[in-house]
Structure formats: C-alpha cells, structure tokens
Amino acid sequence: MSKRIFALLLALALLLSLCACGKEGAGKGEAPVRSGNTDAGDGSAEMVPGYISQVIELPEGCSSVRLMTIEGDKLLAVCGGGEDYRLCAMELGSESWSFLPFKGEDFGGRDSRGFSNYGISGFDVCDGVLWVLVRQYFMESGGEGRFHVLRYDCASGEELSRAEVGFEAIAGTESSTPIFSDLIPLGADRAALCDYENAYIIDSQARLLETLPLEGFNFNLVLRRGEELYVCGEENGDIGLRSFDMESFALGSLVKTEANCYGYYVSEKGEAFLSQDNGLVSLDVNTGETESLFKWLEVATSLEFAQEMGMAVQSAAGDYYTAGISSRNIQKVSPSLVKDRELIRLWGVSDLGILNAALRFNSTNEDYRVEYELIGSGHELSQQEILELVLQDRPDIVYTGSLPQNSIDAGLFVDLLPYIDADESISREDFIEPVLESMIRKGGLYELLTQVDVLSLTVRAELFPGRKDWTMDYVEEMIANRPTGEPVYFWHRDQKYMLDMLCRISSGEYVDWEAGTCSFDEGDFARLLQFVKDTPYTTEAATPVLMEPIMGIGSSVALSRNFFQGDYEYAGFPETSGNGSYFTDSAQFSKNGYGILASSEHKEAAWDFLRLALLPENQEYGLDLSFGIPVTKAAFEVQLEKNIYEDVMFPEYSFTREDADKLRELVYSTEKMALKDDTLTEIISTEAAACFAGDKSLEDTVRNIQSRASIYVAEQA
C-alpha cells in the first residue's frame, strides 16, 4: 500500500468575479430535461483563437518521458521502460518514432535487485548535434561511478562520439562532494558541464577547456530561442533572465520578470516563453513582460499534463510539445480557432479526483468548459464568510466542505437525485448503498460525495476471535494478558487520538441525524469512553502492538503489518453494531463533497461534469486508495485492482489480492456513516476531559453529553 503516490499540487491564482444573486429554492425535486448536447448552443457559436490538444503515444516499449528537446523537424526524448532508458526521435510530420543507438549495459545496466545503475541528467541539442550526459553510479569494481558524454547527429541518428569525463567537479559551499547536474551544448563541439557553482567548458571528447564560476547566473533556466540562449540571472537579490553568448560566454543585463525562471524551453520558431501561474506565457526578453498563452488546465488532456511542467518545446510551425514528470505520453498543443464555450464555474479545493473530471470534461465537451477556482484565492476564510461569497457571486458548483453544514439544503443547492435517476450512465444502484443513503438528507441529495473513507480497528490476526466474540470483555482480557512491555497501540496513538476516534464513530453509532435524536445514554458508549480513559498508552516506538486504529484506509495495510509484525484483521470497534466500522465523509482528512447551486443557469451541464467524478474511467490516472474510496462500486473495484502491488524488497508494503479481498469485504459490510462534526466533537471532548481528570463521574459525563448533544442534533434536523 506504500506504492508511490502521484502527487500533484495546484496553484491556481484566479480571482473571484462578482455576479448577480440567483433565486433561492429553485430546482428542488424537478427532473432535469435534456435537449441535445446539454442546454447550450444553437449550432452557430462564435469561433475564437485558442488551442487544441493531441496526445502523442510513445514508441513501443516506452512507458514514460524523462527529458525532451527539439531540433528542426525532429522531437528528441529520453524515455523509460523495460530494462533500459531509450533515446527516441520522432519526425514531426509523420509522428513516426525511431531509436538512437544506446545500451544501458554499457553504463552498468541494472543490479541484481533490478535497480538501474545509471541515469541520464543532461539531454540537449545545438547546431544539429545532440549531447547526452550519462551518470554511472557505481563501477563493477566497487568504486565510485563516472560521467560519460555522448554525441549524436540529429539528422541521421548516428553516434558521433562518447567519452568519459576525466575530471571532477570542484568542491564548494553548495556541496562538499559536488556532482555534474547539467549539460548545456554551446555548439556542435563545445558544451558547458555544470555543477551547482561552476560551468566547465568541454570539447567533444569531454576534455576541460575552461572553468566559469556561476556568479550572477545559473542554468536552472535554459531558454533557447533559435540561435539565442538565455539563462537564469541573479543581481542584488533580484531574479530574472540573462542572455548568454555561446562564443564569448558574456552575460547580458538582468531582465526581471514575474515568470518562473527555471525549466527547459526551446523554440524553433524563435519565440520566447516560460511557465507562470500554472500555464505558459509569452515573454518579451527585453522588458520581462509576459502575456498568457494558455493555462495547463485549459489544454491538458489528463492529470499528467495539468501541472507546473517546466519543460516545453515549440516547433517551427508553432506547435507546443509538453510533458510532465515521467509522463506516459507527450501532449501536442496547437494554435487553432475553437468554439467559444460557456463557462461552468467551480469553486473548489485541490482535489485530484475532481480535477481529473474537469480535464476530461474540458477535453470532450463541445459546448461547456469548467473553470476551476480555488475558494478564497489563498485567503483564510471562515465557513460563514465563504457562504456569503457564494451567495454574492453565485458560481455553478461549490465544494461543500467549505460551507456550514446547515446551509447545504434546498435553499441553496439543487436536489441531485432526479439527475441521477434520469442519467443513462449511472443509477442509484451503482452507489455503495450506505454511502448514498447517508447523502440523502432533508428529503434530497444536495451534497454529492465523490470519495469516502473508513474508520475501523485492526488487530493482530492470531488474536481475532471473530466479530461475534470481539467484545469489550474479550478486548480487556486480551490487554490484561499481553506480554509485559508490549504496547496496546503504537506510540503516536495516544488518549487524545483515541478520544477523537470515539467522537467520530459516535456520530454514526449514537446519532440519528435525520430524526434529530441521539442515544449516548444507551448501549455501550459509557464503556467505550471508560476504555479510552483506562487503556495504557506508550511513548516508546516499540512493536509488535495489539491493535491499530484506522482513520483512513489507504495506509491501513502497511501500518498494521508493520506495527503487528505479522498479519491483520479488520476487527472494528467492540460493542458496536454491524461490523464495527464506519464510512466517513472525510477522505484523507478532508471532505470530498460538491453541490450544484439552485441559482446556476447551467445545472444540466454542471451535472454532466460532476458525474464524471463518479465513473470508473475517472480512476485511470493519478488516484489510488490513499485519496479515499470511490462512492460507486465500479469505481471502487477499479481502484482495488489498481492498488494490487507486490514489493519484493519490503513485503510488508505490498497490497496483495488477499488484502484487496479483505478490504472489499470490509467496505461492502460497513453499514453506517460517521460524519466529521466539530460541534459534536467539542461536546464529547470537553465533557470527557473533566471525566478523565477525575472531576466528574462517568455517569454524570454521559448524562451531560446526552443532554448537550440532544439539543444540538435536534437543531440540525
């Protein structure tokens, strides 16, 4: 379960624009009416300048793009896949691929564990010659590795030379053991081999010609515009770009700019562009002024292209080619006249699932596109302040986790049940039943959860007697009879953590939100509270432990196996109903809920977008169970299959088919939803604190919780 998670961080700097308020209460309970391709357009939409995107598949045997450049009518790339890196060339006209001669085994290949013994850290072209910097990590003799410089003729693909770098980088203040990190061609026969403090000018045989201290500039930015080269410049604390004369090495004056002065950009058309504000901007190299070309979100065809890339090249025809970090393909972005589409305004947060849906929607819908705005534009706002902004500005879709819970009703949002019932691609039966039931409140579905998580308790497999016999008596006896010094929980699961768990499950076990009632004075709440108080906790990181509370299913398998030093079972909480586990609306500790405003003029199109987040196709890239459990069964099954993974070196981090079967059984047998409610948590926590301190009896504590919670829960119904 510790598979590398693809982490994407959005930084959308979009301003909230004001608009007139709509009508409250509109759309409740009315079945949507479809007319053609949603509710826009009459077939005579205006065409405006824009961009169209195309995905270019990598050649067979390649699974990711590592580095990329362009020369004339050829796109050149370092691709990963299989046992070796591949040096690839694509003809721009035919988009056909060929390979340059390169064998990883010449540089150490892979070791006995399957890890590559080399890497490619430099890949650039100048005057028709491609330069490649290969770092060999270790020698067969056991000594430190070497750096190698390879040169290729771009037209023929023929290898021109290869040479081992015969000198070492100079130790400096940045690193006592510096390494060569970049290779910048300065012509067909000269290049700059760089560490973090110096540029070493070398010839075609990697012989040192001259050493240039990186004072006032560095190669964090490489911008090639035709025959001109620009680099990152520094002066008196200011950062910008400087021209770099490839013959004399002279630097031009610093040109300050708000664009990001890092990354790799090449234009065969002679234009200058850089990344800025999650998009590409044209750049005036004389003034530093920029103008937006496009946002990644507007042109990206999938999540791998919707990030701050820092790598883009442009052909002489004006087409841009982009690739994210280890992208599975290359994206071509071409200027074109496009249909002027209506906007669906989404106020949200950084949510990988909803972003993926937005990208799919924007790349396929002919009449609408989603504009993704971060709520609050980077300002810390209260839920009430955000609600006031929503009422003022009236976007089409809002992230409901940012709003007061009692505002999510027919007064502000449309009921989505009629949309689900009228949709041919999804139905109520497609949802995990208890999750759908929990979303229906106050007579309708006003908040659509796209992901949930599970609260549970795992126990060492050999200690689990089965759910029927998993009682408080059994658990207390198990703890009393444990070996001396063996902890109950791992050290970071303290009393406060376990009390928070009890507060969370209480909202599902002892509260009926629809009826507005609670039952803390019935059942075994008092005994669970006493258990939280009396359980021995530890501050030492000792293993094995007896139990592990699960607040997020994504890491449950790896944590349980590590803490137990063996197998696990989902036992659930003792003396609770069903399987003792609970869905929670807070996946990865934040709610993934959205609603369509009743005032929206594009409700049908907004639903067409929102439902994409529920479909199994939305799970294809970037998401895994660490982000939560999809609320539809088909999407959940896709995630289960995606997450099956065997870690040969660290088996405890594997997620096997047996693990998938256990999780499937847990999810489909869980019956209740435990909502994250700050007020209920505050009531239970403050009353429990007095009990734990010995200032109040258990009976009085439970009585006070029941009294205070009854009033609060009744107000929410």
Each PLM stretch: what is its role?
Residues 339-351, 368-374, 397, 609:
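Short, well-ordered beta-strand elements
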Residues 527-608:
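Extracytoplasmic/periplasmic substrate-binding proteins
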Residues 588, 645-714:
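C-terminal capping/gating helix-and-loop segments adjacent to ligand/active sites or protein-protein/ligand interfaces
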Residues 91, 128, 153, 157, ...:
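Helix-loop-helix "hinge/cap" segment bordering the ligand-binding cleft or interdomain interface
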Residues 62-69, 112-125, 169-186, 216-226, ...:
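Repeated scaffold domains used in trafficking and secretory/extracellular systems
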Residues 369-431, 440, 562-563:
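Extracytoplasmic "Venus flytrap"/periplasmic binding protein-like
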Residues 403-456, 569-583:
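Hinge/lid segment of periplasmic solute-binding proteins
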Residues 457-462, 584-602, 621-625, 631-632:
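A bilobed periplasmic-binding-protein/Venus flytrap-type ligand-binding module shared by bacterial periplasmic
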